[in-house]
């Protein structure tokens, strides 16, 4: 009879998955993570102990899980700004843009003006007000409708308005509105392209635009950067080893310079002490020679009789000097 136990597994043991699980929907709450080199800097600060590889793996999982949320919010600093989402403040009593040219409203009562004000505007009309406010801050002139600055401002208002809408929806339900986040991704990529073109064409206008719109622009990395956890961990470990090596070499160099300066100072002090001792011994030897009569201690300095010797030299020249034949007068 065939034994069925050979073909049926009755164990309830759970095997580990073949692929690692990454929670790519992590919510980022730390504004410091908006820096594109944040995780690389944190990897360099990890202590080099027996838990270094585990800490590096945990940091990599956090990096992968934060990329999606950072991609949606980092460029506009929306992690730090959660109240207004970078949108300009508009006075509630202000007349809506499409009714500003109506002369009838200038003499209308306050109750009528309130109906046409921003306070009574719909979400769509409020979005138009935000767009107009951002566009006015960067466009070149009043008739500017096709410049890159105007396009970037319009896309920025759209991104921030939709991000605010995603936040409002998230407070009512846990299900993420992917139909809206996908559109935000497309608009972000379109704005990134416009920023790159503006930066290549006019650096001054580019700096003015990102300053007026408060956009954090970072030059994108090359597509050859590492993707897998193992490659990223190895790259961070190599950078850490190089940094530690340079740091250690710098410390040894500073220590060597201090030791050299200390050795020079000690050598000069010893040389000075030996020279003083040598001068003292030489002075004692001279005193002994004076006592024994081998030498005499001179007082003052001898000066020869310059005038008398000069006169004697001139007289001898006149008496005994004979010039060579070539110098005689013909």
UniProtKB/Swiss-Prot annotation:
It comes from Caenorhabditis elegans. Its main location: mitochondrion. The keyword Ligase does not apply. This is Small ribosomal subunit protein uS15m. Belongs to the universal ribosomal protein uS15 family. Keywords: Mitochondrion, Ribonucleoprotein, Ribosomal protein, Transit peptide. One of its GO terms (biological process) is mitochondrial translation. It comes from the Eukaryota. One of its GO terms (cellular component) is mitochondrial small ribosomal subunit. Component of the mitochondrial ribosome small subunit (28S) which comprises a 12S rRNA and about 30 distinct proteins. GO terms for molecular function: structural constituent of ribosome. InterPro entries: uS15_NS1_RNA-bd_sf (IPR009068), uS15_ribosomal (IPR052137). It is found in: Mitochondrion.
